[in-house]
């Protein structure tokens, strides 16, 4: 076998499910051909040669990390709301007074796709320096048919400019815009549902999301949105049960949803539905921390039910101003009780599943994309242990060094 690139003297954490949690192969090699993993195994069994061979001097190799829930495309600043929350005002109060998402909507509507993409690129660079190779980016700060499409075009532009894989999610049902105040159902019918059809037809969105909450959209409105998404051939996911138990996790599982995200208030019925549907529970400790919440997601119950759990930054200008996936993983361990292998799976294997990309990325397996992160650490646990340190040696995406 002739490889394009052969990595030798490596320690691999393949993240294929196994007894040690990491799928470790010591004294290993990995062969790449045509941007994909062509062979993995012990160095003593390398089945061919390569045009380029690189010795990694016992460095660890993992799948490139995946941030499966972000709001990286936006304009404007909401640091004053941070000050208001520090003064004791709740996020719900700020939102109802015209702040929160509505503030970002005003600024984002005034920006073009190029400006939005340029801002997102500065944020995505911080993730790249931590070994991230795939990022999900949501719309949701436009809330008109044209401005939401502008946000999705910006996300596609980020993919082209950054070299990273971007999964674009239509989140028009993020908040009710001012011009539809008190008429959320009419907004769903007149803006969100037609927009789903347009985004699917134009190839702008890979999935549809909604914010199902008392300050967002009702379960009935979310259901109408999901019916339209499925009819358009787009998978669904949901901001579910963050501030109250709305039955969101159960609802998105009913539609075979990719993920239920936040899920602090998800009940036993919702967990059972997620387990049955294979819906991933996405933990967002950055928002939990920034909002000073006390209700933790039901990690132990999801673990017992066999629900796959992912970890993401929820990077956004208001409730989770976090562009460090490694910090999010650290928080998920300390605040929510994930084990280190669970947190690592949450940034790789399970994050890929939350995006519907588990056949392409998330583990080191023959046939998958050669998206790799190489680390200067003694053990994989060290990658998550430290806050603020970036132990990344380098990234390989689609078989090429970045």
Swiss-Prot record:
One of its GO terms (cellular component) is cytoplasm. It is an enzyme of class 3 (hydrolase). It is found in: Cytoplasm. N-formimidoyl-L-glutamate binds at residues 141, 316, 318. Zn(2+) binds at residues 69, 71, 239, 314. Fe(3+) binds at residues 69, 71, 239, 314. Pathway: Amino-acid degradation; L-histidine degradation into L-glutamate; N-formimidoyl-L-glutamate from L-histidine: step 3/3. 4-imidazolone-5-propanoate binds at residues 78, 141, 174, 242, 319. Its EC number is 3.5.2.7. Binds 1 zinc or iron ion per subunit. The keyword Disulfide bond does not apply. Its cofactor is Zn(2+); Fe(3+). Pfam families: Amidohydro_1 (PF01979). It catalyses: 4-imidazolone-5-propanoate + H2O = N-formimidoyl-L-glutamate. Keywords: Cytoplasm, Histidine metabolism, Hydrolase, Iron, Metal-binding, Zinc. One of its GO terms (biological process) is L-histidine catabolic process to glutamate and formate. The keyword RNA-binding does not apply. InterPro entries: Amidohydro-rel, HutI, Metal-dep_hydrolase_composite, Metal_Hydrolase. GO terms for molecular function: imidazolonepropionase activity; iron ion binding; zinc ion binding. Belongs to the metallo-dependent hydrolases superfamily. HutI family. Catalyzes the hydrolytic cleavage of the carbon-nitrogen bond in imidazolone-5-propanoate to yield N-formimidoyl-L-glutamate. It is the third step in the universal histidine degradation pathway. This is Imidazolonepropionase. It comes from Maricaulis maris (strain MCS10). The lineage of its organism: Bacteria, Pseudomonadati, Pseudomonadota, Alphaproteobacteria, Maricaulales.
């Amino acid at each position: 076998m002739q490889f394009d690139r052969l990595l030798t003297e490596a320690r691999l954490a393949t993240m294929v499910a196994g007894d040690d949690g990491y799928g470790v192969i010591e004294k290993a090699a990995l062969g790449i051909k045509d941007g994909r993993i062509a062979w993995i195994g012990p160095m003593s069994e390398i089945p061919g040669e390569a045009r380029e061979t690189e010795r990694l001097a016992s460095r660890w190799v993992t799948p490139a990390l995946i941030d499966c829930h972000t709001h990286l495309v936006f304009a404007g600043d909401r640091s004053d709301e941070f000050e208001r929350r520090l003064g004791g005002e709740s996020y719900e109060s700020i939102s109802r007074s015209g702040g929160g998402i509505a503030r970002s909507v005003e600024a984002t509507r005034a920006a073009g796709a190029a400006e939005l993409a340029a801002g997102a690129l500065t944020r995505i660079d911080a993730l790249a320096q931590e070994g991230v190779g795939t990022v999900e980016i949501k719309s949701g700060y436009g809330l008109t048919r044209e401005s939401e499409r502008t946000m999705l075009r910006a996300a596609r532009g980020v993919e082209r400019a950054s070299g990273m894989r971007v999964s674009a999610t239509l989140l028009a049902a993020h908040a009710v815009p001012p011009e539809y105040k008190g008429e959320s159902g009419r907004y769903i019918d007149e803006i969100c549902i037609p927009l789903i059809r347009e985004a699917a037809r134009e190839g702008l969105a890979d999935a549809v999301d909604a914010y199902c909450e008392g300050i967002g959209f009702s379960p009935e409105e979310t259901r109408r949105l999901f019916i339209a998404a499925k009819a358009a051939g787009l998978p669904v996911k949901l901001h579910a049960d963050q501030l109250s138990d709305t039955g969101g996790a159960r609802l998105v599982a009913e539609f075979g949803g990719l993920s239920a995200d936040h899920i602090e208030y998800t009940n036993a019925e919702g967990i059972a539905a997620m387990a049955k549907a294979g819906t991933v529970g996405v933990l967002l400790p950055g928002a939990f921390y920034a909002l000073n919440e006390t209700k933790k997601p039901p990690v132990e119950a999801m673990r017992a039910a066999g629900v796959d759990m992912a970890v993401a930054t929820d990077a956004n200008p208001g409730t989770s101003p976090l562009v460090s996936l490694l910090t999010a993983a650290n928080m998920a361990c300390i605040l929510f009780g994930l084990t280190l292998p669970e947190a690592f799976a949450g940034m790789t294997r399970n994050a890929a599943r939350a995006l519907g990309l588990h056949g392409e990325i998330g583990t080191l397996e023959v046939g998958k994309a050669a998206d790799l992160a190489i680390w200067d650490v003694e053990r994989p646990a060290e990658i998550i242990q430290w806050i603020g340190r970036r132990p990344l040696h380098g990234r390989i995406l689609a078989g090429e060094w970045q």
